[in-house]
Amino acid sequence: MNFTKLFAIVLLAALVLLGQTEAGGLKKLGKKLEGAGKRVFKASEKALPVVVGIKAIGK
């Protein structure tokens, strides 16, 4: 009957609507990873000259 066509349309609509919700969670995770990467980069920028200076003194 037409039940299979109706079921397919409802299923497709649900996938489209619920698929957008999933992207929000992945976006939040991406932002957290990006923030962690920035913090590590800034910390290494501060620490690297100190490490190079200690290594130069030890020569």
From Swiss-Prot:
Pfam families: Cecropin. It comes from Aedes aegypti. It comes from the Eukaryota. InterPro entries: Cecropin, Cecropin_insect. The keyword Protein transport does not apply. The gene is CECD. This is Aedesin. One of its GO terms (cellular component) is extracellular space. Keywords: Antibiotic, Antimicrobial, Immunity, Innate immunity, Secreted, Signal. Antimicrobial peptide. Exhibits antibacterial activity against Gram-negative bacteria, such as Escherichia coli, Pseudomonas aeruginosa, Acinetobacter baumannii and Klebsiella pneumoniae. Shows no antibacterial effects against Gram-positive bacteria, such as Staphylococcus aureus, Enterococcus faecalis and Enterococcus faecium. Exhibits antiviral activity against all four dengue virus serotypes and chikungunya virus. Exhibits leishmanicidal activity. Partially neutralizes lipopolysaccharides (LPS). Belongs to the cecropin family. Salivary gland (at protein level). Induction: Up-regulated in salivary glands after dengue virus infection at day 5, 9 and 14 (at protein level).
